[in-house]
Amino acid sequence: MKKITYLLLVAAVLGACNSPKFQTTTQRDIDQLTKSACFEMPKVPIPAFPNRTYNVADFGADPTGIMLSTEAIQLAIDDCNANGGGTVIIPEGIYMTGPISLKSNVRLYTEKNCIIFFDHNLDLYDIYDEWFEGIPTKRCTSPINALYAENIAITGHGTFNGNGDWWRPLKKAKMTDAQWKKHLKEKGGIVDNNIWYPDSASLLAQSYCLDQNVPVITDDSLWQVVKSFLRPVMLHFVGCKNILLEGVTFENSPAWNLHPMCCENIVLRDLNVRNPWYSQNGDGVDIESCKNVVISHCSFDVGDDAICMKSGKDKPGRDRGIPTENVIVDDCVVYHGHGGFVCGSEMSGGIKNVQVTNNLYIGTDVGLRFKSTRGRGGVVENIYIKGVNMVNIPNEGLLFDLFYGGKAAGEESEEELAARMNATAPEVSEETPAFRNIVIEDVTGMNIKRAIYFNGLPEMKIQNVTLRNIMMSATYGALFRQTDGLMIEDVLILPKEGEAFTLAPTVENVKINKK
């Protein structure tokens, strides 16, 4: 009798830990996905929390958005953590806050009709050592951050708004005249070469950028001067374990939206991730050097790559040497983005064991995008993609671009690409990226500019790719270059112009079974 009573008590306690009121994802949901993987996928545990609640209203949070609620929200999180964990509740309302740090064993739950704005006041954001776009640098504190935390979650129905339009440079070419004038009137700032910057310091920092968006600064005092340029990613978890993000909306991030780095056991489910289509570096989710990840039933409508796998850039990424591995992406929709599902270009630590199933891409610049360039190094391998539909794709449905130049698909001139392609091929070294052992099947595409484009490196061709049961209607067909080991089985390309398939002389070991 005592044993039965004890078991019932344990069951009651465990049930209270993950009450459906605070999160709906179950371990069974995730286990069903991980068991379906084409590779050996470890169990991804759902974090559990004690049955204790802490309402930010009790700590002085202002639901009108007039006063900052940073201290109240952080106090609630800290108190919850100090007492062994539980759930911090942000009730219905409008909240203005600075950066908040999530702590171990804390679930942040947002009620319906709740929106959290992150104030763009630079004084609230400290500068610290960080990684951005795959290399070490300095950035401002991320609005939502966690460092080496375990068992953390953000759930509920609320919206997190990063106020990114106060941070991001903006190109006039991406706006209508009315939108441009409205932005200048509301935000002030300065304009240089038809690009808006929040202030002169941000423009100054741009002049120090030798490669993309990371300034090369040797004078430490200058970092504070150019602070407005050091846009943070909105959610940044580093070295964390057992993570759940569920049900909420993340939008309007200063740079990338969601960025777990060097984390383990991550579940993203039922999320709505949004950024304006013109947002500079407005990625959806960037999984960097993480393992055991499930992304399920999420919606993305963003300004850059939507669902992206990364692992560091060039020598710093290779030195870190942590791949992104064991990832499942299932039942996701992408509306706008530079790519629906993307590997790279920062993949120097490697990417392996990734399965993408049942995805829909509507109007993304590219559907499935694999990109890198000389100097990266790293290996992308064991990628399995099945069941993808895509429509209204203005560039490629499937793209392998090993001459990536840092611009969105379609933005680079033919002369720029030709200059890189015509350069003398170097010897294979640790700086040579490799893409191999990739299966893509059951893909349907309609209204695509070019169905498929493979452009590998002459010194390291794209290796061992299987394309099976694919149908695409496009303006142009499929073009393959620098590929070794290509299986084309039951693939139907319907081009409006030219040939359905074009294989350059640099393609080897091809087997084609066309419909």
Regions found by a protein language model. Give the residues of each.
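Sec-dependent N-terminal signal peptides
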Residues: I4-V13
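Extracellular/periplasmic carbohydrate-active domains that bind, remodel
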Residues: C17-K515
